Swiss-Prot record:
Family designation: Belongs to the bacterial ribosomal protein bL31 family. Type B subfamily.
One Pfam family per UniProt: Ribosomal_L31
Keywords: Ribonucleoprotein, Ribosomal protein
Assembly description: Part of the 50S ribosomal subunit.
Keyword Transmembrane helix appears in the UniProt entry: no
Alphabetized InterPro entries for the sequence: Ribosomal_bL28/bL31-like_sf, Ribosomal_bL31, Ribosomal_bL31_B, Ribosomal_bL31_sf
SUPFAM superfamilies with a match to the protein in the record: L28p-like
GO biological process, one term: translation
Entry's Gene Ontology cellular component terms: ribonucleoprotein complex; ribosome
Molecular functions (GO terms): structural constituent of ribosome
Name of the molecule in the record: Large ribosomal subunit protein bL31B
Length: 89
């Protein structure tokens, strides 16, 4: 392996800019901003827009939409009703 060609891998604190949630992880990305972590050490701080704390998929606020199939689109396009559909169900 060649010497001095690999990026510096270090512990970094990532902070969600929308919720303020922070977590410590390893990264090759650095920053001039620093923050003191719970263990008393100072680490570079990287601000990110979305984390598992704010993403709708992980928070349960995501809305699922049912995509219409080909038959449904055809029926909607030509104004046809499904006679087999049970409106009471």
């Amino acid at each position: 392996m060649k010497q001095d060609i690999h990026p510096n891998y270090q512990p970094v604190v990532f902070m969600d800019s929308t919720t303020g949630f922070k977590f410590l992880s390893g990264s090759t990305k650095g920053s001039s901003e620093t923050v003191e972590w719970e263990d008393g050490n100072t680490y570079p701080l990287l601000r990110v827009e979305v984390t598992s704390d704010s993403h709708p998929f992980y928070t349960g606020r995501q809305k699922f939409t049912q995509a219409d199939g080909r038959v449904d689109r055809f029926n909607k396009k030509y104004g046809l009703k499904d006679e087999n559909a049970n409106p009471d169900a």
